[in-house]
């Protein structure tokens, strides 16, 4: 590893120099561009980036209006389709790069479903895999500058979480009948405590879709708002704005991590809920 | 500096609700720190427990998110 890096440094020393100069020029241009527009302090509001706009024409926004949210959701669906269709076109024994990406994602989620929810949850794997890829790509596409983050809207994540909640509840009753209610009756607790625990379990069950959706939307939205706040600092500080720009780079790296982790957390909680539906007995 | 008392209360309330996010940070740090402490004692068992780690962090975080939600509601919905 160490010899590898010294080798490349020796070979592409000039190229690396050019890259540094380009990055420096880019940063200066970035700050200079901000100087013109945002000299008056925090002129950009950090929440403006979440505004939903019509793509075509004027007028009110209805259910079937094509907005920027619709566009970016469609793009993330297209990315998922592209990854899976393009990745599995060859189906060779020695996978190509796209095929190994597709296999990696498939194997990762399949392993997660099997580990967390058990083998008999595997029939529901396609749904969980779809959820994971959609959220992952929506998060990552939202990190592209000037794009729109669909998962930062509670309206989007609430639909996803409600779909999971309804699926899991209906599945629980279909699979176990009234036995599904034993999820709320903690049989390992002392008898006197059980009614109180039942109430707590019931509340926590119905709070699930709320926390499930707001966790994703809140994390993504807060991260993007912080980026915009720092961008406002960079504009207000003038040449010293280089410090917030470095901060933006660091936070951006953190946001890439958060985007992946939140997709993972959403999926793994879906698996936990599914396990509760399939095996409600404590 | 205009505005009424109700708006002031709204902002103060939102700020107070944001304290809950800090409390959730303590909880998440507790989960992750204890995981690390356990993982360093028995590294061979650590890999199988990462899913549990993330579930624990998610549950600890959920209550902080409710505080965040209250702050949001106070700022934009009231």
From Swiss-Prot, chain B:
The keyword Cell inner membrane applies. HAMAP family: ATP_synth_c_bact. One of its GO terms (molecular function) is proton-transporting ATP synthase activity, rotational mechanism. F-type ATPases have 2 components, F(1) - the catalytic core - and F(0) - the membrane proton channel. F(1) has five subunits: alpha(3), beta(3), gamma(1), delta(1), epsilon(1). F(0) has four main subunits: a(1), b(1), b'(1) and c(10-14). The alpha and beta chains form an alternating ring which encloses part of the gamma chain. F(1) is attached to F(0) by a central stalk formed by the gamma and epsilon chains, while a peripheral stalk is formed by the delta, b and b' chains. This is ATP synthase subunit c. One of its GO terms (cellular component) is proton-transporting ATP synthase complex. The keyword Cell inner membrane applies. The record marks 61 as: Reversibly protonated during proton transport. Keywords: ATP synthesis, Cell inner membrane, Cell membrane, CF(0), Hydrogen ion transport, Ion transport, Lipid-binding, Membrane, Transmembrane, Transmembrane helix, Transport. Its main location: membrane. The chain crosses the membrane at residues 11-31, 53-73. It comes from Jannaschia sp. (strain CCS1). Belongs to the ATPase C chain family. F(1)F(0) ATP synthase produces ATP from ADP in the presence of a proton or sodium gradient. F-type ATPases consist of two structural domains, F(1) containing the extramembraneous catalytic core and F(0) containing the membrane proton channel, linked together by a central stalk and a peripheral stalk. During catalysis, ATP synthesis in the catalytic domain of F(1) is coupled via a rotary mechanism of the central stalk subunits to proton translocation. Key component of the F(0) channel; it plays a direct role in translocation across the membrane. A homomeric c-ring of between 10-14 subunits forms the central stalk rotor element with the F(1) delta and epsilon subunits. It is found in: Cell inner membrane. It comes from the Bacteria. It is a multi-pass membrane protein.
């Amino acid at each position: 590893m160490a010899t590898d890096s010294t080798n490349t440094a020796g070979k592409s020393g000039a190229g690396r120099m050019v890259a540094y100069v380009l990055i420096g020029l880019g940063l200066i241009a970035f700050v200079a561009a901000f100087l013109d527009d945002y000299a008056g302090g925090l002129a950009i509001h950090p929440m403006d980036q979440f505004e939903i706009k019509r793509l075509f024409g004027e007028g009110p926004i209805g259910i079937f209006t094509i907005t920027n949210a619709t566009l970016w959701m469609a793009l993330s669906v297209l990315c998922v389709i592209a990854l899976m269709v393009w990745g599995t076109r060859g189906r060779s024994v020695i996978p190509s790069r796209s095929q190994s990406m597709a296999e990696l994602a498939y194997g990762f989620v399949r392993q997660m479903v099997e580990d967390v929810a058990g083998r008999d949850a595997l029939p529901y794997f396609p749904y969980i895999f779809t959820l994971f890829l959609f959220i992952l790509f929506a998060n990552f596409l939202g990190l592209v500058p000037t794009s729109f983050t669909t998962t930062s809207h509670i309206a989007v994540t609430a639909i996803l979480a409600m779909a999971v909640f309804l699926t899991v509840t209906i599945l629980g009753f279909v699979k176990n009948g009234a036995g599904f209610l034993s999820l709320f009756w903690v049989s390992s607790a002392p008898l006197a405590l059980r009614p109180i625990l039942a109430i707590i379990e019931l509340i926590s069950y119905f709070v699930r879709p709320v926390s499930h959706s707001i966790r994703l939307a809140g994390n993504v939205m807060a991260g993007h708002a912080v980026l915009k706040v720092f961008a406002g600092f960079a504009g207000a500080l003038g040449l010293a704005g280089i410090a917030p720009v470095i901060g933006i780079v660091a936070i951006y790296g953190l946001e890439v991590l958060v985007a992946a982790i939140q997709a993972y957390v959403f999926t793994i909680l879906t698996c936990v809920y599914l396990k509760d539906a399939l095996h409600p007995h404590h | 500096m205009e505005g009424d008392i109700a708006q002031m209360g709204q902002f103060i309330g939102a700020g107070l609700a944001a304290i809950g996010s800090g409390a959730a940070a303590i909880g998440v740090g507790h989960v992750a720190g204890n995981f690390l402490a356990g993982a360093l004692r028995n590294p061979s068992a650590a890999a199988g427990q990462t899913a549990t780690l993330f579930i624990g962090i998610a549950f600890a975080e959920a209550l902080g998110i409710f505080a965040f939600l209250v702050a949001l509601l106070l700022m934009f919905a009231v």
